[in-house]
Structures are given as C-alpha cells and as structure tokens.
Amino acid sequence: MSEAFEIVKTGIDFFCSHLVFFNMLFAILIVFFQRRDPKSVWAWLLLLYFIPVLGFVFYLLLGQDMHKRKMFRIKEVEDHISKDIRQQEYRLRSRDVQELDENIRGYEDLVMYNLEAGEAMLTKDNDVDIFIDGNEKFRALMEDLRNAEHFIHIQYYIIKNDVLFNQIKDILIEKAAQGVEVRVLFDAMGCRSVRHSYWKWLNEKGVQTAEFFPAILRRLQLRINYRNHRKIVVIDNKVAYVGGFNVGKEYIDLDEKFGHWRDTHLRICGSAVLGLQVRFILDWNYAADENLFLRPELFRGIEAGTRDFCDMQIISSGPDKTTQQIHDNYLRLINKAQKSIYIQTPYFIPDEAILNALMIAVKSGIEVNIMIPCMPDHPFVYWATYSYIGDMVMAGANCYTYNNGFLHSKGMIVDGKVLCYGTANMDIRSFALNFEVNAVIYDEKRAQEMVDIFQKDLEVCRQITRDYYVARRLKIRIKEQICRLLSPLL
C-alpha cells in the first residue's frame, strides 16, 4: 500500500514540477504562432504562467485565433456586384463629377477604402429613419413584416423567447403560411437560453432557422469570442433594419434592472438594402450550409427611397477578414475631423491607435464628446471602460454617463457631416473578434439629426469632470486598473 502511495506521490510531484514548463511551452506554441497584438501576447503569457490551469481554461474560452480557419473563408459576391464596385473605383480615381457629389467631398479616400477593403458599394438613393426607442422600432418592424410578400430575413445576436419575440413569431408563422420565405439566423451564444426544441418547432411551422457557430453540447458553450453580433432584417429587398436593438423584453423597457433602454437602430429604403441582404446571405450560407447566391430572385426588387436621398456604404468586419474595416473607418473619421466628434458606446475599450487619435484630436482643438452608460451590464468591461474614459477626461474630452436607464447606442458623428452607426461597440471585441456591421452615411441632414439626438440625451447625463474623476475612491481605482490590465484578453 505504501509503495503504491509513493508511486502516486512521485507522479504528482513530477506533474507539479513540470507543469510550469509544459504550460509555458504550450503558451509559446499557441500564442506566438497566432497573429495577435503584442499586448495580448504578454497578457496571455502572464496569465498562463501565474495561473496555469485556470489560464488554460480562459484561453479555451477567449483566446484562440480564428483568422485562418476555413470555416470563416467567405467567397466573394456575384460577379455583377464586383463589376459595379470596379466601376465606382474607376470613377473615384478619375474624379468623375457625377460620382463626387457634395456629400462625399473630402471623404473620397474613405469611400475608396471601403470599396477596396470590403466591396462596400456607395449607394445614393437611400431613405433613413432613425429609431432610438425600442417600442417605436419594433412597431415599425412588425408593420413591415406584415407587409412582406416574398421573403423575410432576420438576423439577431440575441433572441429571447419572451413577450416581444412571441409577437414577432406569430407574424412570421402567419407569413410563412402565406408562402413567404422566412429565415431566422441567430447566434448560438447569444440565444443559449432558448431551447433547441423551440427552433425545431418554428421549422415545423415553416420558419427556417439556422444557428451560427453552435457548441457540441448546447449548454456548454465555450466559445465566447467570434460571435455573430450583427442585427439585420431585410424584407423583400424593399426595406432593411440595422442597429443595436436585439430581441427581448429589456429592449422595450420591460426589464426592471435596466429600465429605459436607449439604443439606435436604422430603417433603410434604397439600394443600400442590397448590402445588408448580401451580408445576411453570406452569414446564412455558412450557418445553414446552403448557397442562396444560386437564387437570383433574392437580389431583385431593390427600389429607390422616396424622400430625401442620402449616400451610404454598408461595412462589416469579423475574424473572416484580414482588415478591421469598422475600426479603420472610425480611425479615419477621427483623423479627418476638423470641428467635432460625437461618440456613443456602451463599452469604450479602444486600441492604442484609436485612443491616441482621439487624444490628438482633443489637443488639436477638436470638440470630442463621449457618452457611456451609468450602469454596467458586464462589470469587468464597465470598469475597463471607465479607466479609458478617465484618459479622455484628463486629456480634455467631454465625457458623460447616461443616467436615464441603459445606453446601448453604438456609433459616431464627425463634423456634422458623416455618421457611422450599427452593431459595433468602440472596443477590441467588436473591432477584431466578433462579426459586426455598420452603415456609413454621408449626409449632413442625418448627421445633424443624430447630433441633435445626442444633445437631447445630454439632458439626462452627468458629465465626468476632472475633479470628479480624480476624487474617485481607491476601491474604484483598483477595479479600473485590474480590469484595464486584463482588457487585452478580450
């Protein structure tokens, strides 16, 4: 018995004594041979060194790089779309007078970048309605759903089986019974609370569903990164929606924890709808293992808007791309700003490039305004956000907390001329790790409308002054520094 005990003890001693060595070897192999930011590399090495077992678990949850996985290699869109893009590039390079209308003067380089990096066509015949209240947004959406004649494409990161989706679900089942093609694409992590049997039941009712990046064991979803954070609805190619609202009762102010939910969502009519349709179909093809590009009728029926037109590009980013297109648009817009920058975001964890660009803008006399929530929905991210906000406050930016519920709006307005709004937060996760989609709108009227909304929000905000920030308690400072130190792991 004692000999067996000694053998076991020797084995345990050997394992413990070599654990650090093998852990560091593992860390070098998996971290250095994947493309990532140097700060992220060192953060992972320190975590794996000091907390070997727990660090490994965290790496499984957050750390792996998916850039080179075949599962994210998405093919280019149909040839005729690429042809239109090449023609726009030629006109921009030759400074074609028709192409360079007043709205995009000064932003030709950004338009060109979006054409080259993301095949984002510039469309000029778009109507845009801006929703900042969930009840108004979903009333409009459900009315558009009831008017569908050919197809309904719905994609959300979070769909909860509650009072809101019950209303939407009834409409979808009714339209499917009328012969309308209905597709619902949802993220496995965001919708993990919904039972698989529910989606199966919807399929039986004629509503096609597909799950993005499912786990082998549904209740054991280990992949926190690389989630599909997009929120897109396309109806008959006549109207599309994109923005920050998911589907759940909290988004229509029925959750006691958050109270009023302040978000931003766009309703679009015009040729930009095609950009969102293509984006949905690319994601659907991957999740459903289907090729809807073989269905040309799904790309017909685009109609111009009927009111004041605006120029727009639909841009997207994710781990399937070699460029961080949304990040680069934010960075370029900040660098091009001459008068003012307005930012709303629930999470403010910028990389060094964007943080430095914002600080340079402040020191150059540009008015920089940043609005964040007054309450956390994810405490770790909130305290990291507050740390970076502190940098901006000390640099001279105008920073505010929204105190009338929870702020989930995501976007930026520059010089009252251009706005970039959609699903992407101002953080590392949205820039590099998740699948996102934004609309870049080159239009003074819509940009000024969004500035006016921002100014109205200020009535229920509290400004974070230098004195207020410096006087924060030691406990809060410690939280900030710990969370900021770990923020590269996001």
Model features per residue range: what roles?
Residues 343-345, 402, 421-422:
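Thr-Gly-centered strand-to-loop micro-motif
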Residues 205, 367, 371-378, 385-386, ...:
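Cytochrome P450 I-helix active-site segment
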Residues 410:
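Catalytic-core elements of nucleic-acid end-processing and repair enzymes
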Residues 1-328, 332, 336, 360, ...:
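N-terminal localization/anchoring segments of enzymes in phospholipid and broader phosphate metabolism
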Residues 353-355, 382-384, 414:
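Histidine/acidic-residue-rich catalytic or RNA/ligand-binding cores of hydrolases
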Residues 337-339, 347-369, 373, 378:
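Helical hairpin unit composed of two closely spaced alpha helices linked by a short loop
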